[in-house]
């Protein structure tokens, strides 16, 4: 069902973009289980570390994880008046499951939920659906006519769109293939220890698939898992080329770039950069740099299209970023959420962060300054996933605008229109007065191993998602 928002006057859109100060920031154990985050054995730091900010009335600043920081503030950029507004276009609602994954391509939107159904939407109306029978759909990526889905049960399904009927989807296989599983099972050396007293084939994930990332140029698919590994697949023949023992806890996010670099974020509190080398028909990934080591779980990653900036979100509600010139250098921290950051997307000069606090923060990058353009509110549950597409109609008018899809555990997908030239003036005024929402300077020293020692650890137990 599509709920129209076009009947709302444009002047009222600004009212949608302020967080409700009365929203509860309490996350119950039931909610933790509901959005698929499991506790880690890693120790949590005490809340005494955190110096709560003084602006209690500010919706943006009510985070229980906000803390004092040694970094200096940057100045807010000036904004123009009479700029286009951001706002809700509509909602896609089908009361059958929490939304865990999204993927947008051309005029189609794919949504995955814990109902085991994958639904396809076109022009904001339900267009098609197909059942996967393989557990909660945690990730969806699209490569040409192929759709890859990652599942809670550790499986990766491959689907194809019918060339005669775009609404028909047929499962074309599973990764790894049954043939490869059979061949690998004949050799004892292909079994690795995945848990105490438990072994499994190295080509199979032994726990939930948390994230998928495509490198279309190289024809590769990356899958991250709670089994602490990243696996590399060749799309052409569905072969598993490599299994990377990447982290000491669940891998929550993986992003492949066009420059042979892969980034991974984990519940162990680290973000790692991997260098990909081609060795004949196979790949070899070596660790380049550990970007951060912190107590809070890394829950989301995003990389700008040109690879100039890497963003990661954490269970403490913070978004950190690195800037890349000749090497990766720590750039700053964005504070906009009061609960865990669950998803990130970068589009043009904008950064979008979705959170368990039910909001989406929209940031604009200009050099080393990030301005919070607006806070999109409307979901009644944690925002679990985001997808962003260029607004083609706005592009024709030379107005750089984006269509943002947000999936939530409230069982809905909301559709937003966001302009790069719009700034919520009320939000900006509040930020300036409190001087709390800011980007920090490049003053923090790096450790000898090249990693940044972050003090942004949180007392949250939301480590896997």
UniProtKB/Swiss-Prot annotation:
GO biological process: pollen germination
Quaternary state and interactors: Interacts with TCP4.
Biased composition (Polar residues): 21-30
Keyword Nucleus listed: yes
Domain of life: Eukaryota
Chief location category: nucleus
Name of this chain's protein: Protein JINGUBANG
Motif interval(s): Nuclear exporting signal: 344-346
Summary of the function given for this chain in its UniProt record: Negative regulator of pollen germination. Prevents pollination in moist environments by inhibiting jasmonic acid synthesis. Stabilizes pollen tube growth.
Region of interest (Disordered), ranges: 13-32
InterPro entries per UniProt: G-protein_beta_WD-40_rep, JINGUBANG-like, WD40/YVTN_repeat-like_dom_sf, WD40_repeat_dom_sf, WD40_rpt
Sorted UniProt keywords: Cytoplasm, Nucleus, Repeat, WD repeat
Species for this entry: Arabidopsis thaliana (Mouse-ear cress)
